Amino acid sequence: MQITPENTWAAVKAIRSRAPLIHNITNYVVMNSTANALLALGASPVMAHAQEEVEEMVGIAQALVVNIGTLSPSWVRAMASAALKAADRGIPIILDPVGAGATAYRTRTAFQLLETVSPTIIRGNASEILAFESVETMETRGVDSTELSQNAVDAGRRLNDSYGSTVCISGETDFIIGDRAILGIRNGHPLMTRVTGLGCTASALCGAFAAVNSSFTLAAAQAMAVMGIAGEMAAEISPGPGSLQLHFLDILYRLTEEDIARRLRIVAGE
């Protein structure tokens, strides 16, 4: 199994033609930007977090994205209910453990969601992935990663072995672990780190690609590749982070097969 420009473009076309409904229980900071990115890609976003309706909403969605960026007890209950319903329906579940390791509550919540239902894809930075291994000691790592992505590969392997989840570790090189393979993608630009919420956007795009793909490892790799390609193209014409946000959406909307073929950078695979 390998990511190629051809299968990545085929997935983009599938998203654009099918417009899969992606149910996001995400944080206040990124709701708008995440929804706009999904729309630009061609998917259909919905942001619903009330426990009274999440199961019903999952019932019509093609993927569920759970993001713990802004937590409250009612949201945690809604996340668990939605995840159980998604598992019952057999649709992809993407978990973004934002800031896991920063506080005990955040780390426990991420671990409880992992235990409640094994997510299809877990996407986080290296510190967040490593936090799953320190859940007993509650080592504080912070919201932004203090680790290189390659430092979490072994932890990602263990998560994959234990829960069957594809693990996507974002960083300068994105590592995707699953299907008895490790894929490495090296697209993107340093300016992307100056825009809040692009990691959360990547998780949402994982949901869109998982909705049209039978291989969730490939779906995560394709999502990270498209995210990185659009980001680096946007950075090339942006003097700062404000304009990058605007150009990112436009380029995601206009992305072509030629863009992917010219820019996709695969640096590891086995």
Swiss-Prot record:
Q: Which family does it belong to?
A: Belongs to the Thz kinase family.
The coenzyme or cofactor needed here is: Mg(2+)
State what this protein does.
Catalyzes the phosphorylation of the hydroxyl group of 4-methyl-5-beta-hydroxyethylthiazole (THZ).
Species source reads Syntrophus aciditrophicus (strain SB)
Q: Where does substrate bind?
A: 47, 197
Catalytic reaction annotation: 5-(2-hydroxyethyl)-4-methylthiazole + ATP = 4-methyl-5-(2-phosphooxyethyl)-thiazole + ADP + H(+)
Q: In which pathway does it act?
A: Cofactor biosynthesis; thiamine diphosphate biosynthesis; 4-methyl-5-(2-phosphoethyl)-thiazole from 5-(2-hydroxyethyl)-4-methylthiazole: step 1/1
Q: Which GO terms describe its biological process?
A: thiamine biosynthetic process; thiamine diphosphate biosynthetic process
Q: Which InterPro entries match?
A: Hyethyz_kinase, Ribokinase-like
Keywords attached to this entry: ATP-binding, Kinase, Magnesium, Metal-binding, Nucleotide-binding, Thiamine biosynthesis, Transferase
Going by the entry's taxonomy, the superkingdom of the source organism is recorded as Bacteria
State which Enzyme Commission number(s) the record gives. 2.7.1.50
Protein name in the entry = Hydroxyethylthiazole kinase
Q: Which GO terms describe its molecular function?
A: ATP binding; hydroxyethylthiazole kinase activity; magnesium ion binding
Signal peptide location: none
| Enzyme's top EC category | transferase
Name of the gene: thiM
Where along the chain is ATP bound?
A: 123, 170
